[in-house]
Structures are given as C-alpha cells and as structure tokens.
C-alpha cells in the first residue's frame, strides 16, 4: 500500500491494541469469584460479548446513552440466561466491572513490537469511543502511554466515531492533514469508513471477523500490520 507522505498514525484502542475480550473476561472472572451465579463464566460470555457489541453500535449511533449501554448489556445477557437479576444487582455488577476492567493490562500479541517499530518514524495517537478516565487507565496500566502524543476520546471531543467531527478535531489538534494521516482500527463502520470519509488512509485490523471488503487493506494480526510499514 502507499504510505508515502504519512506523518501521523491514529489507532483505535479497544479490540485493536488493548485486548478487550481477554481483559473483559478476566474482569468478569473476578466478579464471578465474588458473586454466586448458577451458570459458568463461559456461558455468560457467550451471550454477553455479542450483546455488548450490539449495544456499543447503538451507543455510537446515539440511540442509547452511556447509562443505557452499561445497564442493557448486562440486563439483556441475564434475560438470555433466564436469570432474574434485580436492578440493584445489575448496577452493582456494572460498577464492579467499570472499576476492575482497566486494571487488566493485556494487549494483542505484537502490540509493543509494532509501536516500537513505528514510534521513531511517525507521530502516534489514539482515537477511541471509550470513556475518558477508563481509557486513560487502560493506556497507563498496559504500559503504552509513552508511545502516544495525543489521546482523543469521544467523551472529551463530544463526538463518537464515525462522526466526521471527531476526526476533524483530532487532525486539527495534532496539526496535520487527512492526506498525511492513517487510521488503524477494528471497526469497519466507526474506524475505517469514518476515516476514509475524511480523506485519511486506513487499515482494518479485523480482530473479530467482520465482513471482507475492498475499501482498504485488511490485516488479521499486528505482525501482519507491522509488515505493511
């Protein structure tokens, strides 16, 4: 692919560098050890992960609030499991989840090698739809903070990917152009189309098997991504 003229590389965080599924699973494992549920963690996660993904899509589209997202993903999972969970229990689990999640530091295999290879050739930044404090804790606790000049969260900017404004404001703050920038992320809708629509280049890290497309290069590992640079 053509990388000539690129000065700035923007990464998504969750599902791209930070291994969300692994860290989320460990978070729920900790919660399950504290609370007594009549089903296994594996069964819970089988329902929770796709529900969480669907709720995040609704959140990106401004169809639900942050509070709705946090409540619905648990409530709908318990409904699938035919488990009667009170509002108080759901809120308790949600608070524990938010508190514990960012303490787990696991990155996708090859993350540090990739960032080390790029840090002296490009300016590196993050654009994430995650919540400000939580994302900052994730970055700090996983040991990658020093690689990035700017971290843009939807909460801070006021717009979620794929809204044009989060890309426009990020490019302006970094003092670069769309033509000199590339976006790397796992979400075709939020990361790839959002960036391409603003004139940026993009690489799709297809970490959870979205549909194949021809809009930009697709990679399935960070080692494969590193080879493109």
Residue map of PLM features:
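Asp-based, Mg2+/Mn2+-dependent phosphohydrolase catalytic module
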Residues: 1-9, 22, 88, 112, ...
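N-terminal helical cap/lid subdomain that shapes the substrate entry/recognition surface
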Residues: 3-108
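A short, Lys/Arg-enriched amphipathic alpha-helix followed by its capping loop at the start of a domain
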Residues: 31, 114-121
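Secondary-structure boundary/capping signal
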Residues: 39, 85, 105, 122, ...
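Glycine-centered short loops/turns at secondary-structure junctions
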Residues: 121-122, 199
């Amino acid at each position: 692919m053509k990388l000539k003229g690129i000065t700035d590389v923007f990464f998504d965080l969750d599902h791209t560098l930070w291994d969300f599924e692994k860290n989320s699973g460990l978070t729920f494992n900790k919660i399950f050890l504290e609370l007594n549920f009549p089903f296994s963690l594996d069964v819970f996660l089988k329902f929770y992960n796709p529900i969480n993904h669907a709720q995040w899509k609704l959140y990106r589209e401004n169809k639900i609030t942050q509070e709705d997202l946090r409540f619905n993903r648990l409530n709908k999972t318990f409904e699938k499991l035919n488990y009667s969970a009170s509002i108080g229990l759901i809120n308790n689990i949600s608070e524990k989840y938010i508190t514990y999640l960012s303490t787990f530091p696991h990155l996708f295999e090859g993350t540090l090698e990739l960032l080390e290879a790029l840090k002296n050739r490009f300016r590196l930044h993050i654009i994430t739809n995650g919540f400000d404090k939580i994302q900052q804790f994730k970055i700090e606790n996983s040991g990658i903070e020093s690689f990035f000049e700017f971290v843009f969260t939807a909460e801070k900017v006021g717009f979620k990917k794929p809204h044009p404004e989060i890309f426009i404001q990020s490019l302006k703050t970094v003092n670069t152009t769309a033509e000199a920038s590339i976006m790397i992320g796992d979400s075709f809708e939020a990361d790839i189309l959002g960036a391409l629509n603003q004139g940026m280049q993009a690489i799709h890290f297809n970490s959870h098997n979205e549909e194949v497309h021809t809009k930009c290069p697709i990679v399935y590992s960070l080692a494969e991504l590193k080879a493109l640079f």
